């Protein structure tokens, strides 16, 4: 039972998220042989003020 965790910044549409989990499921199934119904994809969305790169919050990057 493959489990895929994806952390991403919030803001994508429901359609984009549906397409993402479908594509990830298909790729994992193709490359592992696991049936799609046994593949779990967990999406964790975070706000831009809860994520940083190089010590700079993503929310602060946009303010610059």
UniProtKB/Swiss-Prot annotation:
Q: Which family does it belong to?
A: Belongs to the 4-oxalocrotonate tautomerase family.
Task: Quote the EC number.
Answer: 5.3.2.-
Report the Pfam families cross-referenced here.
Answer: Tautomerase
| Source organism per UniProt | Lactiplantibacillus plantarum (strain ATCC BAA-793 / NCIMB 8826 / WCFS1) (Lactobacillus plantarum)
SUPFAM superfamilies this protein is in? Tautomerase/MIF
Name the UniProt key words of this record, in alphabetical order: Isomerase
Can you tell which superkingdom this protein's organism belongs to? Bacteria
What are the catalytic residues? 2
The answer to whether the entry has keyword ATP-binding is: no
Aminoacyl-tRNA synthetase among keywords? no
Entry-linked InterPro entries: 4-OT (IPR018191), 4-OT-like_dom (IPR004370), Tautomerase/MIF_sf (IPR014347)
Q: State the protein's name.
A: Probable tautomerase lp_1712
